Amino acid sequence: MSSISQNDLSNLDDGSKKEIMTFLESENSKQKVQMSIHQFTNLCFKNCISNVQNADLSSQEEQCLNNCVNRFLDTNIRIVKGLQSIQ
C-alpha cells in the first residue's frame, strides 16, 4: 500500500482536497460508532452474561442486555447534549 506525501496533497485542487476531507471525516465518524458499539457490547456482556451455556440468551440475559445498552445510549446522549449546551 502506498503512502501519500504532503507534496502529493499540495498538488490537489480545492475540490479534491474537500472530497478527501469529507471522506476522512466520514471514516472517522464510522470508527467512533464502531468503538462505541464495541465498548457497550463488552461492558454489557460482562455485566449480563455470567455463564455461556448455549447459543441462545435467557430471557433475563436478554432483558439485562437491552437495559444496559439503552442506559449506555441514554448516558451518551445526555453527555453530548450537555457538551453542546456548554458551547
UniProtKB/Swiss-Prot annotation:
Gene Ontology CC terms: mitochondrial inner membrane
Q: Which UniProt keywords apply?
A: Chaperone, Disulfide bond, Membrane, Metal-binding, Mitochondrion, Mitochondrion inner membrane, Protein transport, Translocation, Transport, Zinc
Tell me the Gene Ontology biological-process terms attached to this UniProt entry.
protein transport
SUPFAM superfamilies according to UniProt = Tim10-like (SSF144122)
The chain's disulfide connectivity reads: 44-68, 48-64
Q: How does it sit in the membrane?
A: Peripheral membrane protein
Q: Which InterPro entries does the entry link to?
A: Tim10-like, Tim10-like_dom_sf
Give start-end ranges for motif Twin CX3C motif.
44-68
Q: Would you say which domain of life the source belongs to? A: Eukaryota
* Subcellular location as annotated: Mitochondrion inner membrane
Pfam families with a match to the protein in the record: zf-Tim10_DDP
Write out the GO MF terms.
metal ion binding
Functional summary from the UniProt entry: Mitochondrial intermembrane chaperone that participates in the import and insertion of some multi-pass transmembrane proteins into the mitochondrial inner membrane. Also required for the transfer of beta-barrel precursors from the TOM complex to the sorting and assembly machinery (SAM complex) of the outer membrane. Acts as a chaperone-like protein that protects the hydrophobic precursors from aggregation and guide them through the mitochondrial intermembrane space.
Q: What is its quaternary makeup?
A: Heterohexamer; composed of 3 copies of TIM8 and 3 copies of TIM13, named soluble 70 kDa complex. Associates with the TIM22 complex, whose core is composed of TIM22 and TIM54. Interacts with the transmembrane regions of multi-pass transmembrane proteins in transit.
User: Domain text from the record?
Assistant: The twin CX3C motif contains 4 conserved Cys residues that form 2 disulfide bonds in the mitochondrial intermembrane space. However, during the transit of TIM8 from cytoplasm into mitochondrion, the Cys residues probably coordinate zinc, thereby preventing folding and allowing its transfer across mitochondrial outer membrane.
Which family does the record assign? Belongs to the small Tim family.
Q: Would you tell me the protein name for this molecule? A: Mitochondrial import inner membrane translocase subunit TIM8
Q: Which organism is it from?
A: Kluyveromyces lactis (strain ATCC 8585 / CBS 2359 / DSM 70799 / NBRC 1267 / NRRL Y-1140 / WM37) (Yeast)
Q: Which gene encodes it?
A: TIM8
